């Protein structure tokens, strides 16, 4: 491991036990359209992990629900989802041994690259007292994981 200078983590299911949290939040947000459509959005989320909520809600509104259906629009879905997820991320389990792994990798930069909302991730990790571990930064949507990684590599923040 002596040649490794950075470790890049995903958030959901890696650092935080939060995969089910987001599935439940997507379901809850879509429930005003009915259980059938809420289940369809939750299933779409599961099948398309790592894609931003912006894209998932746009897909839901444009491709899943029928034209003229009554229910919350894009901004309301986004706001409800953000509130629900943030509340649950503040309470979910943190990966066991994270602190001891950080201690064993002192000389390496830690980064988070996630499909989650970047501002929300920074706020949650700050409020949970975990932000200091990620000295390389905490990155998320609206940019995709691929775009974030390309930028970090091109700016020599991650060396391969």
Locate predicted features.
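Short alpha-helical
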Residues: 21, 52, 119-120, 143-147
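N-terminal helical cap/lid subdomain that shapes the substrate entry/recognition surface
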Residues: 2-11, 15-96
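A short, structured active-site edge motif that brings together acidic residues
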Residues: 44-45, 74-75, 130-145
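Short, acidic loop-to-helix structural element flanking the phosphoryl-transfer center
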Residues: 83-112, 118, 122, 146-147
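Short active-site oxyanion
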Residues: 107-112, 135-136, 160
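Conserved Lys-Pro-Asp/Glu-containing loop-to-beta segment of HAD-superfamily phosphomonoesterases
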Residues: 6, 145-160
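Hydrophobic packing residues within well-ordered alpha-helices of enzyme cores
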Residues: 26, 57, 121-125, 134, ...
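Conserved hydrophobic residues forming the short capping helix/wall of the S-adenosyl-L-methionine
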Residues: 30, 61, 125, 129, ...
């Amino acid at each position: 491991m002596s040649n490794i200078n950075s470790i890049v983590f995903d958030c959901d299911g890696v650092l935080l036990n939060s995969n089910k949290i987001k599935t439940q939040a997507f379901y809850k947000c879509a429930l005003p359209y009915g259980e059938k459509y809420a289940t369809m959005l939750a299933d779409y989320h599961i099948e398309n992990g790592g894609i931003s909520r912006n894209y998932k809600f746009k897909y839901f509104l444009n491709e899943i629900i029928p034209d003229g259906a009554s229910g919350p629009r894009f901004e309301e879905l986004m706001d409800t989802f953000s509130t629900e997820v943030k509340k649950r991320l503040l309470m979910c389990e943190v990966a066991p041994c994270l602190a001891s792994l950080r201690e064993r990798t002192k000389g390496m930069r830690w980064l988070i690259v996630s499909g989650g909302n970047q501002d929300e991730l920074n706020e949650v990790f700050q409020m949970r007292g975990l932000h200091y571990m990620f000295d390389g930064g905490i990155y998320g949507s609206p940019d995709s994981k691929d775009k974030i990684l390309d930028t970090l590599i091109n700016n020599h923040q991650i060396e391969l």
